[in-house]
Amino acid sequence: MTPRSYLYVPGDQSRLLDGAARRGADALIADLEDAVAVANKGAARTAVASYLDTGTAWVRINADTPADDLAAVADRPGLAGVVVPKAEPALLSEVDVLLGSRRVPVLALLETARGLRHLHAVAESPRVVRLGLGEADLAGELNLRPGPDREELWPIRSAVVVASAAAGLLPPVGPVHTAVRDLSDLERTTELLLRQGFRARTAITPTQLATINAVFTPSAEEVEKARATVALLSSGTGVAVDADGRMVDEAVVRSAREVLARSEGLQEQ
C-alpha cells in the first residue's frame, strides 16, 4: 500500500515510538531532526536504532549529520526508508554513498530555494521514490507570508507534482498542518492538496491521522463512478459519452484508473 499518512514521532521519545504503530498512521517517521534538541541527538539515534530492531519506520535524518545518523540506523531490520530534509543533489548523493549497497528508499523533502532550483535533479536522484514539501522552511527562506490557503506556495506545489510525475515517482506528500486542534481546517486544506495532485500528508499528532486518511481514500461513489468510466471506454471506440453527458476518452480513463488503483491498494493492506 502507498502511504496516505506519515506520522512524525520524536526519536528521543521511546515511549511514543513504542505506541505509535497503533495510532493509525500508514507509515511512521522516527524523527532525528526538528523534533529532537541538539543535546539529545545521540540519545535519539540510540532509541530509534533500538526501536527498528522490532518495529518499522522511516527515519528523518539531519542534513548536517547524515553520516552519524545513518551509521546508527542503516543496518536495522525495521528501516523502511530515509527521509532527507532540505534535499539538494549534493546531499542526496552523499546519502546514496553512505547507504552503499543497501536497498533503502528515500523520501526527499523540498525545504530550500536551492533544492527547488534543482527540483528535477532531486526527483531523479538515486533512491528517491517520493517528494515531500516542508513549507514552513520554504516560506522562511523565501520571505513569504502565507495566508490561510497558502496560495503563495501553490506554484511550488504544482512544480513538485510535475517533477514527481516526470520522474515516475509516487505522487508527493503534503506538508504538516500546524494548527493541531483544528481538524476542520485540516480536512479543508488536505482536500485542497488532493485536488492539487498530492496523495499523502505528514502529521505531527495522531489526532490528525483519521482525517488525512479519509481524504486520501476514494469514496464508494468515486470508485463506482471510476469503474463505470473504465467500462464505458473499454466497450467503445476510443471516445464515449457518460451518463452525465461528459466526453470520456483515454485521459479521463487514466484518472479513473488512478482512483481504482488507490482503492485496490487499500484493500490489499
What do these predicted ranges mean?
Residues 1-269:
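Expand to "…catalyze enediolate/carbanion chemistry for C-C bond making/breaking, isomerization
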